[in-house]
């Protein structure tokens, strides 16, 4: 376990079998150590794991726990190549502003709570820009926290590409809490 209390272990096979790779800090490319990843143990902290090297491709947010097969973290396949610890601010405060248009224009909604459906809660089809005022959040491509994920730290995002998306297709979001 690192000084910050973060640790993640990747296993080649399901149910924590086969070769393993232990990590306690950000790693831009571990696929040379493991040809595939079918299970993970997060023993400390919350982690963002990525399909490709250099924190690229599909991303999955994994809080502390055990994931005996890749379907448990909503993985599309057994390929993972990089990871980074998610650093949560102290104080436990959360606040986000979402906008129906880019550059913080159009209707704005502010919340401090998770949202399983932006259509039901805010009557919006998409999010085109946002300001993360407090905390760390995850945007999801589909309602009920499903689909592609995007990690948002405290800053302003003028357009979807700023949070790593090709389109404004965000249908749900939630806070990362420990």
From Swiss-Prot:
Coiled-coil region(s): none
Any GO BP: morphogenesis of an epithelium
UniProt-recorded Gene Ontology molecular function terms: structural constituent of eye lens
Domain Beta/gamma crystallin 'Greek key': 6-44, 45-87, 94-134, 135-177
Stored InterPro entries: Beta/Gamma-Crystallin, Beta/gamma_crystallin, G_crystallin-like
Comment field on protein domains: Has a two-domain beta-structure, folded into four very similar Greek key motifs.
Name of this protein: Gamma-crystallin S
Organism: Homo sapiens (Human)
